[in-house]
Amino acid sequence: MPPKIRTLAKTILKDPEEVKIAISRPPESIMQTAYICYDPQKLKILQDLFTQSRPQRVIIFSSSKMKVKELASTLKRLKFNVAAMHSDLEQSQREEVMKEFKSGHIDILVATDVVARGIDINDIKLVVNFDIPHDPEDYVHRIGRTARGTNGEGLAITFVSIDEQAQFKRIEDFLEKEVYKIPVSPEFGEVPLYEPEKYGMNKRGRGRPRKSEDKRSSSSPQKRNMGHRGRPKKV
């Protein structure tokens, strides 16, 4: 509770009781990674990842049903086995999509946060945050879906554009840890620096680019889990 709210409550309430709820944290067994990039680069990097290693049991989260529809449609055109889950679907349609996803007939599920809350599937190999959630706890709920398998391990990849850097920094502060930033391959062009204090949610601009082969957070122990060209070894 913010200090000002606590002070106000004490002035207007008589002997108030304060209940503290434990803050949820993702399992340590989840390897959390991020790409710092420009918004148009997100799809290109995602396509490259899926081309290098066939995606299986992947959930991609996007911020709105319109974006979910667009992303699913684009991935279908790229010949990926994908389905969309959003609020415009009838209940029977949602159930059919989930049935196909659980059975393995669909490799990739693109979904919004609200609709995806009812998804309870084990052995999700990868969670992709194509857009960053506004609430850090939504981030925890998202990536937690990839740690429900038999070994409790999982992989989460988050794409962070300039306008999302401040949001992502809040997530890192909430987690009390720095998420490993995967170096972007030079083939995708220059990428922005990770400067969340400069490029907040309401600050727009191209940002100061850097060459994508420059390494960031190179001291992270998670580097040993990365393949060549900075890609995760497994998808």
State each model region's role.
Residues 103, 174-235:
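Basic Arg/Gly/Lys-rich low-complexity intrinsically disordered segments
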Residues 1-193:
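Conserved helicase RecA-like core
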